Amino acid sequence: RVEPIGAITLGRAGKNLTEMAELVEAGCIAFSDDGSPVSDPAVMRNALAYAAMLGVPIMSHCEDLTLSRGWAMHEGAISTRLGLPGYPAAAEEVQIARDIALAEMTGAHIHICHVSTAGGVALVRAAKERGVRVTAEATPHHLTLTDRWVLGSLGEPVAPREPPAPPTRGKRKRKHEPELGLPAWLVPTRLPPYDTSTRVSPPLRSDEDVDALIEGLRDGTIDAIATDHAPHSHVDKECEYGLAAPGI
């Protein structure tokens, strides 16, 4: 089953709204500029207000471009070690906070695409608790991989193990490999360092972020797992790490 999602703004440029009512009449079930954020808060406010009247959600790619400008991977110890410019968690979180506030103001349904940070999960959880119409998704790669995968063979490999069984009751404490900071059942492959297959948007985050996403999925803060499918040609990937097209 395939359902169309219309663009929020013309050309996904973040400036002028599309003819949302006509697109809903034509069959669109939601609106998104996914891949590009709606940076202007006034434009997003208007989009949410119209969407509320039309009874459809806005799906938001949350990224503050002034904070993520020039990024190659998640900002942290690994990016420093590899000499790559970072995309801080705050670049996602400040826009999640903004869009939740605007959804609360307008009464609209906001859907946060590809949440990747612990702070983002916390913001969505708090908004749900106070009754904001917010839903969220996470991707398989953000639920299972960390920024250590960018290290590839520079990291310390350990023997793979079977994934843990689901918890029977209460919160399960996850065991980590101290050398890698990864779940014991998930370890990096022998990828070369700077392998561009690990460059995605938003970037692979820290182990703490993965833990928070999994906990959010378990407690209902994260409503869905979405692929965020972004296929690219070999030409787009076989280049310098920071210039490679992000996506899996």
PLM feature spans:
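Gly/Ser/Thr-rich active-site loops/lids in small-molecule metabolic enzymes
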Residues: 92, 243-248
